Amino acid sequence: MLTLKKSMLLIFFLGTINFSLCEQERNADEEERRDEPEERDVEVQKRILPFLAGLFSKILGK
């Protein structure tokens, strides 16, 4: 009976840890999804600003 209790306690403990890790990973994924649009905006700005600067310099330079 004592070994059964130890086994059950071990299974419960490992299951709790596994559930906790999965929950943390899921929360991290949700945070990543929330961050993506902002990161995309920054990437687009990085691509567009040099293009516009070059375009304006060509227009104003001529």
Swiss-Prot record:
It comes from the Eukaryota. Antimicrobial peptide. The keyword Signal applies. It comes from Pelophylax fukienensis (Fukien gold-striped pond frog). Keywords: Amidation, Amphibian defense peptide, Antimicrobial, Cleavage on pair of basic residues, Secreted, Signal. Expressed by the skin glands. The keyword DNA-binding does not apply. This is Pelophylaxin-4. Transmembrane segments: none annotated. One of its GO terms (cellular component) is extracellular region. Residues 23-45, 61 form a propeptide. GO terms for biological process: defense response. Belongs to the frog skin active peptide (FSAP) family. Brevinin subfamily. It is found in: Secreted. The modification Leucine amide is found at L60. The lineage of its organism: Eukaryota, Metazoa, Chordata, Craniata, Vertebrata. Residues 1-22 form the signal peptide. It holds the Pfam family FSAP_sig_propep.
